[in-house]
A protein has these predicted regions:
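Hydrophobic helix-and-loop "lid/oligomerization" segment in the mid-to-C-terminal part
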Residues: 1-99, 104-134
């Protein structure tokens, strides 16, 4: 049981740990409680990372002290970004992502934004602020 617990819940691949390090180095905070991580194709290529190395990155960055909203912008291919959003009880993640054609649940949602990484970052931040400010 102990080895299975460790293998499934307490270990991460070296690629995953390196990716977490790269992501942490680039974290940005907006409005004092929105933490945003960006994962580019260049980052993925540099580590030869795969889809499974990216699992639950949004929850990982939500661990930042004071962060009520965690946004991950991941470039899937040139011109296409996947957004993962995790929120506290004061912001409906599904309502935010619905503004951008996505959906999900109150505390976890996602969408796809077509355009540059910079555009995706600006659009999701604008949507968070729109829903938050009512």
């Amino acid at each position: 049981y102990a080895s299975a617990n460790k293998r499934h819940f307490r270990t991460r691949s070296l690629k995953r740990l390196k990716m977490e390090s790269m992501i942490m180095a680039g974290l940005e905070i907006f409005d004092n409680d929105i933490v945003m991580a960006t994962v580019t194709l260049e980052m993925m290529k540099a580590l030869d990372a795969a889809e499974q190395d990216m699992e639950d990155i949004a929850a990982f960055i939500g661990q930042v002290e004071g962060a009520d909203t965690a946004v991950t912008v991941r470039e899937l291919r040139p011109g296409e970004c996947k957004i993962s959003l995790r929120t506290g009880r004061d912001l409906n993640a599904s309502a935010v992502c619905a503004l951008l054609g996505g959906g999900g649940h109150a505390a976890a949602a996602g969408c796809t934004i077509y355009g540059t990484v910079e555009r995706a970052r600006a659009e999701i931040l604008r949507a968070v602020r729109t829903v938050r400010n009512g």
